[in-house]
Amino acid sequence: MSSARPHWLLPAAYCLILFTAAAAAAVDEPHGYRLDDFRAHTPATLEGATVVTTAEAERLWRAGSAAFVDVLPKPPKPANLPAGTIWRDPERQDIPGSTWLPNTGFGALQPALEAYFQAGLTAVTQGDRNRALLFYCLERCWMSWNAAKRALALGYRRVLWYPEGTDGWARQGLPLERRAPR
């Protein structure tokens, strides 16, 4: 009995793996905001916004032609810390010159957080709804997608979404700097 496999079997298996991976990574835009499982594959598009690559984000950053908005959540202080424990917020490294508006990328915002988001955008755009706003957080993070969608709903007309976020930025050896929330 021959143990030889048909010559087409290995290439066919390889194609099946590639097709399955591509299908798993293809994500449709939801009708509303993403409400859970924020660290997952994101859509390739955001209706009404421009999706930018790292190279495009770098050009915008160097030209100063967009306000960069980081929406990565700020980790809360653990409620069960032993008495006397000193809590230090984890350091956030983001794109130089950015404004960090933490927690504003969740799918549903409480009124106070919604007001904070609106005030933050008004501050970085000086009230100009035509000012380009670039939203980011981490790669495979729905927070920036939600925040960009929310900015569109608020009437901002030049919304950019950078899905690679600080992960893609750092991979290219571009600078990051420590940031505190606005």
Task: Please state what every model-predicted region is.
Residues 18-55, 60-63, 78-134, 138-182:
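Rhodanese-like catalytic fold shared by cysteine-dependent sulfurtransferases
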